[in-house]
Every structure is written in C-alpha cells, then in structure tokens.
Amino acid sequence: QFEALQGCILAVQEVPAEHTKRYGIVAGQMQSDRIMDVSQIVEKPAPEVAPSRLGVAGRYILTPGVFEQIRQQPRGVGNEIQLTDGIAGLLRNEKVYAYRYDGKRYDCGSKEGFLEATVELALQHSQVGAWFKQYLKALPRE
C-alpha cells in the first residue's frame, strides 16, 4: 500500500466505544472499504468526544517527518511524549492514511490482553499446546 499511497499508514480496527480512551482514534474520509484519508487523530479520547471508533492498532508505516513533529510536541496524555501528537502534526504537511484491517489483535498494554495473548498462543503452540491445555484443565477450580 505504501508504494501506491506515498504517505504514513496507520493500521486501525474498530474498537468498542468504551475502549476509545485506550487508543489513538482517527477520523477522516474513507477512500475505499479499507483506506481512510485521515483528517484527525486524537490520543485516548473519552467515548463522548471520540471522533470515531477506529483505534490505531500499534502498526505504522511512518515517514521521517514524524520525528521532527515529535520533537516539537509538548508532553501529552499522561505527561508522555505521544506518537499520536507527532502524527497529528504531520497532518498539516503530509498525507496520513488509515488501513482498516481484519484479524486477531491482542492489547498487550493491559494485563488482561497480555494474559489473553499468552493463553491463546500457548494453546496453539505446536510443541507445548497439548501440554498447556492439560495443565489448564488440571488447575483447581475455586
């Protein structure tokens, strides 16, 4: 897609409204069923002010200009330097696109998501999956 679009591309997935406060959320004009021309990106907005429910899923193709934008940004949400703020700065000078993708994604930034990923992938593992399944079955139920 990068060769065709020649701009930053952010992987996005639809998230439940109550989860917008966990993600960078994008809004813009859909060019196709998967590609959006991004006009706005907001870091962790409350559900009532989120511009959409399309959350950035932590996969990016970025142009070098984002680094200069990050250097110019004050600290954002959580007193952290936010990549989202750098991307928002890019919108003034460059095209930014969102790519809506299908597929399983684990939010390893939360304890619950990390545990989901660990258990599901362990169960699928060719060498330890069968053992892990038996291990889980043998755990005492409290």
Annotate each language-model stretch with its function.
Residues Q1-L121, S126-E142:
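Unchanged
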